[in-house]
Amino acid sequence: MTLHNLKPATIMSDTLLNEQDYLDLQVLWYLYQFSPDYVQGEYDASHYDQGLIDLFMQPGQYTHADLMYVVDRQHDHMANVLPMYSELAASGQVELTTTPYYHPIMPLLMMDGWTMEDGIRVNKESWPEDVQNHLITGMDLFEDKLGFRPTGMWPSEEAVSPAMVEPVSDVGIQWMVTDEEILMKSTDLDGNMIDVDIASNLATPWLVTGADGGEVATVFRDRVISDRIAFQYGTMTPEAAVSDFIAYLDNIRQELLDAGEDPSEHLLTVALDGENWMFMSEFQHQDNARPF
């Protein structure tokens, strides 16, 4: 496939782009949201698309019809995504989770005010009904599009607090994921601070109980290995990245064995935001990280 570089001489210069340049940029912007391997039919459920392949090979000078062709193909492919998700969930291959509808920071909604670092006071009441509305709206949309109601949740920005446990539990969310730093700042039932450097603590789901008895199982992601996938492995060869990943897991497993624990009774959580995948696309340009 052709790697396009639109008028490199214009970068950091006073040269103006013309209408054709902007049209080329539009087409390339949408075109490169497709994987070249996908449009060549090399992925499961993908089909060979000669029209897109021709546009990949064309060195600019695109037309408005070309732009519409690419956008229409995007719509066609996106229409297949949710049905495929539903199929995978129905077969038990994956579990799909929801997130609050408008990406609210739920702990802030639950707080009755706070003082910012510059000393400015934010005065507000606690808004648990807002939290529930975001959750229910997100779950309703999920059910409408996928055909079933989720029981797991990714909190916006992984932000959690004791106060939000009740509204989350009340809407039927059974489990959620957040960061190991939250666990590090938490206490067990005996009031002891939890040491996340102990493998059996981090690689274990915890049952979090709210003030009124609501319960939500919570897994705390291993930040080290999650961040390696998000930010480091994209600069390594697939072989080196996989070797590092497996070695890390083996070390956790050995720590559990040394502590007299059964590794099969533990769960190590790797969690990262979807937009971090951009860091995975540099695997020596090998098939958008598929070898990994």
Predicted segments — roles?
Residues 1-118:
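N-terminal catalytic cores of secreted or lumenal carbohydrate-active enzymes
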Residues 1-2, 7-14, 50-76, 119-132, ...:
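The substrate-binding groove and active-site-proximal loops of carbohydrate-active enzymes
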Residues 77-88, 130-142, 160, 164, ...:
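Alpha-helical packing segments of well-folded alpha/beta enzyme cores
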Residues 91-93, 98, 150, 214, ...:
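A general structural motif
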Residues 97-99, 154, 176:
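Structural detector of well-ordered beta-strand residues that form the stable sheet scaffold
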Residues 109-119, 170, 191-195:
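Aromatic- and acidic-residue-enriched segments that line the glycan-binding/catalytic groove
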Residues 120-157, 250-271:
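CE4/NodB-like, metal-dependent polysaccharide N-deacetylase domain
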Residues 156-292:
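Active-site-adjacent pocket scaffolds in enzyme catalytic domains
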